[in-house]
Amino acid sequence: MGKIIGIDLGTTNSCVAVLDGGKARVLENAEGDRTTPSIVAYTDEEIIVGQPAKRQAVTNPNNTFFAIKRLIGRRFKDDEVQRDVDIMPFKIIGADNGDAWVEQRGNKMAPPQVSAEILKKMKKTAEDFLGEEVTEAVITVPAYFNDSQRQATKDAGRIAGLEVKRIINEPTAAALAYGIDKKQGDNIVAVYDLGGGTFDISIIEIDSNDGDQTFEVLATNGDTHLGGEDFDNRLINYLADEFKKDQGLDLRRDPLAMQRLKEAAEKAKIELSSTNQTEVNLPYITADASGPKHLVVKVTRTKLESLVEDLIQRTLEPLKVALADADLSVSEINEVILVGGQTRMPKVQEAVTNFFGKEPRKDVNPDEAVAVGAAIQAGVLSGEVKDVLLLDVTPLSLGIETMGSVMTKLIDKNTTIPTKAQQVFSTADDNQSAVTIHVLQGERKQASANKSLGQFNLEGIEPAPRGQPQVEVMFDIDADGILHVSATDKKTGKKQNITIKASSGLSDEEVEQMVRDAEAHADEDAKFEALVQARNQADGLVHATKKQVTEAGDALASDEKEKIEAAMAAVDEATKGKDAEAIEKATQALIEASAKLMEIAQAKSQAQGGEEAQAKDAGQSNDDVVDAEFEEVKDDKK
C-alpha cells in the first residue's frame, strides 16, 4: 500500500509531510523550500504554482490567485467575500449557483479548481521524495469550517487526483504534532491558530498513559474570515490612503499597483515583527499626465498595531466562548500553542499571554506543525502509528427548519465525531403528502440566520390529519465532519437519504469534469516540459557548436562551415516555435551537419596525445630519482 501524505492546505502557505522511519518529515519542494506560497498563476502557456507564481504576480495580477481558501465553499453575496472583491487584484465573480468564483482570461473557475493546483504541487513534492505515485492524503481545514467548506476541500483533493482519506482540523493536527512525544500525564492544551485567512481556537485534552495516547477536543471556536490577509489589507488600505492624500490618485483602481502594494505591505508587516520602523518605498507605482509617481511611506510598529488592534481583539471573544463550552477556567489550561504565521507578530503574542496568564510555547513551528499533525493522522489511518486515538468535534450545531421558521437542533456544537442523532417530526397540515427537510448549521434560533446546507423532499406520505404522520430524521456525521441525512416515514417505511451538498457547491458531474480538465492540463504540462527540455538541449548544442567552429579555424572547409551555420539557423528558428518534435529534428540535423567538426576535434585530440607521450618519454629518466627526506634529530644526551 502506498503512503498516505499529510497536507496543510493554507491560505498563505501550504506544506506537505510524510512519515519517514516512524517520524513525521516535512518535505522540501522543487524550489528547496519547506513551505509553498498558496499562489496559482495562469499564463498563455502554463499553470505556475508557489514561489514562481509569486515572482511573476506583479506582471500578471489579473490571473494570479492568492488567498483562494477565503472563497472556498462561500457564496458570492457573503459579507466576507464582498469585503475582498474591491481589494483583490483579480476578479471575484458570482457563479450560476451563487458561489464565489474567480475569473482568469475570460474563464470562470471554482475555488476548488484553483486549490487543486496547490494540492497537485504538494502531491508531486511527496512523489519526488518517495519515488512512487501518491494517491491518498489527509488534508487539514480550519476547525471552524462549515460543511460546505469541508466538502469543497474534498472536491479540490479529487480534482488533484487524491483520495482524501480524512479531513482533520488544523488545531487538532497541531496538538498531535506537539503531543505525540509526550509520553506520560494529562495535559489540557489551548491551540491558538491565526493563519493567513482563518482563526481557530481549540481546547484539547492530551492523555498519555502507558504508551496509549488520546487527543480529545473539548471545544472549538473561531472565525473563518480572519487572518494575516486581513492584517495585510489594513496596511494596504492605509498605504493607499496616504498616497491618495499626497498625490490625489487612488491606487485601488490599478491592479498592477495593488499587487506591488500587497507585496510591500506583507514585507513591511513581517519586518515590523523584529524592528520598530520600516519604510515602504515603491518608485514608479503609477503615473498621471504630470509624470510618474512614487510611494514613500514610513510605518512604525505602533502604527501597524493601531491599524490591527480590533482584529487582535476579535480573536479573544472565541477564546472565552471555547473555554465556557469546555467548562474550564483560564487557570486550568496547562499549555498554550501558537500556530499560523500571523502569531509571530509581537502584539498577538502579547494579547495571548495576557489572556491566558502564561507564555505560549516556543518549541512548536507555527508554519509546519499542522502538516506534521496531518502526517501523523495519516500514519494512524495506515497503521504505521499505533496507540493514538483522536476524538474531534463538530464546530457548529446541526438541525432542521421546523414550523415557524425555527431551527431545531439535532446535534449540538462540540459533539465528538463521528456521531448520530435522530428525532421524530410530523406534518404541519392535514393530508400533507410530502415534507421538505431543510438542513441548517449554526447557533441561531431563527432558521434564516443560520447556514443552509441543503434541502430534500420525502414524498408519498399517506393522507392523515396534521400531527399524526411520523417522520424520523437521522443525522450522521462522519469522521471528516461531513453530514449525511436521512428521513423515513415510520408508517410506510419510505426513506430518502442524502450526503448533504451545499445549496450551492459543485455537483459530482462538475467535479468529474474538473478532474478530466486537470488530467488534460497534466498532458499539456508534460508537453510544455518536453518543449522546454528540447529548447534547452537545442540552445546548448548551438552554443557548443559555435565554440567548436571557432576552435576549428581554417581546418574547417568553407562549404562545411556554411552547412553547419545553416543548420544552426534552422535550430534557432525551430526554438521560436512550440513544436518540440520540430526542434528535436532540427537538433538532430545539426548533429549530422557537424560530423566534420567531430573529426577535426578528434584529430586535434590525437595529435595532442602524441605530443604528451613524447614529453613523458623524455622525462622518463628522471622518474628513477628519489628525493631524500631528512629529519633533524637532536641529541639530548649530554
UniProtKB/Swiss-Prot annotation:
Induction: By stress conditions e.g. heat shock. It comes from the Bacteria. Pfam families: HSP70. SUPFAM superfamilies: Actin-like ATPase domain, Heat shock protein 70kD (HSP70), peptide-binding domain. The modification Phosphothreonine is found at T198. Residues 602-638 are annotated as: Disordered. One of its GO terms (molecular function) is ATP-dependent protein folding chaperone. Residues 624-638 have a biased composition (Acidic residues). InterPro entries: ATPase_NBD, Chaperone_DnaK, Heat_shock_70_CS, HSP70_C_sf, HSP70_peptide-bd_sf, Hsp_70_fam. Acts as a chaperone. HAMAP family: DnaK. Belongs to the heat shock protein 70 family. This is Chaperone protein DnaK. It comes from Shewanella denitrificans (strain OS217 / ATCC BAA-1090 / DSM 15013).
